[in-house]
Each structure stands twice: as C-alpha cells, then as structure tokens.
Amino acid sequence: MQFEKEVEILASREKVWNFIWDVDRFIACVPGCKEAKTIEAGKLYSATMVEKVGPFRVEFPTTIEVLERDELTRIRAQASGADNKIGSRMKLSLDVNLRQDGEKTVLGFIAGIDILGKLAALGHGIIKRKAEQVLDEFAHAVKQRLEGES
C-alpha cells in the first residue's frame, strides 16, 4: 500500500528540518510511538510502535534506517518490525520532502507499507484506513507543534 500526504507549516524549512532530526520532539508527534532511541545519529534508530488495528493490539519493535539525506530537502528511510505475539511483520519505505513556499514549508510524505501475517488477514481496507488515520494525526501534530513554537 502506498500513501501520500502533504502539510503546509508556517515555519522555515530550516526549522522543520531541525525538528525532524530532534528525535524526542519528533516522536512525540507519532501516534502510537511508545519509545525511540538513537543508535547512530542521522543513520539508525529504534522505536516501539503500539496501535490497535481491528481486534488486534499490535506492538512492533522497529528499526529505522536512513538511506539518503539531502540537507534541508529530502530524507529517504526504511523501517521494519515484527510483533511475534500475533505473528505479524511490517515493512515501511518512507520518502520525506521539504520545500519552501514563501513563509511556509510544505512537508511531504510518500510511504509504502507492507503488512504480513495475521494483521494482513484483516484486509486491505481496514489497514489502509488505520494507516491514513495515523498519517493524518501525525501531520496535524507536527503542524501544531511547529506553528505553536515561537
């Protein structure tokens, strides 16, 4: 499944870029992210994602690897994790783009998500709705956080 989202933020591209790399502030905007750790700054991170999807409560210990980083412009990353309790795996590819538009920064996401195992048995529709909800909540939280800072 692939998802695309753009959000306009009344902040400079530099401010948005710095926010993305401030792991503690950034993860506070990620719905269901219970904890995150920097393993190698700018390259490798770990996080635990907890969500309710249909009848399942999933907990994915996740590894996030930054594959490309173009300063102030683009980040390409991949993540993967598994919930062994319910026998499900998740893979994510993520492309994040920033572009200045006057006083605003347009923050764009393209995410590809693959779900395997019991969670996949819920069907495309349920998983798609949940993924869209999480992405919308995340975009809203980032916008509120950055626009609320002076």
Where do the language-model regions lie?
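A conserved amphipathic terminal alpha-helix motif
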Residues: 68, 116-150
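Glycine-rich portal/gate segments that line the openings of hydrophobic small-molecule binding cavities
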Residues: 37-82, 137
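Hydrophobic ligand-binding cavity/cleft-lining segments
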Residues: 1-46, 52, 148-150
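Beta-strand/loop substructures that line and gate deep hydrophobic ligand-binding cavities in soluble
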Residues: 78-129
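Hydrophobic pocket/interface hotspot
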Residues: 16, 26, 66, 109, ...
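Short strand-connecting beta-turns/loops that link adjacent beta-strands
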Residues: 12, 41-42, 71-72, 101-104
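Intrinsic-disorder/low-complexity, polar/charged segments enriched in Ser/Thr/Lys/Arg/Asp/Glu/Gln
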Residues: 2-6, 44, 59-61, 74, ...
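Hydrophobic/aromatic beta-strand elements that line small-molecule binding cavities or substrate pockets
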Residues: 5-7, 33, 61-68, 92-100
